[in-house]
UniProtKB/Swiss-Prot annotation:
It is found in: Secreted, Cell wall. Its main location: secreted. GO terms for cellular component: extracellular region. The lineage of its organism: Eukaryota, Viridiplantae, Streptophyta, Embryophyta, Tracheophyta. It comes from the Eukaryota. This is 28 kDa cell wall protein. Keywords: Cell wall, Secreted. The keyword Secreted applies.
Amino acid sequence: IWVGISYKIHSLYFQ
């Protein structure tokens, strides 16, 4: 998993 995508998803999920 690319870090950018992971970070983006986590950011949206844990806002």
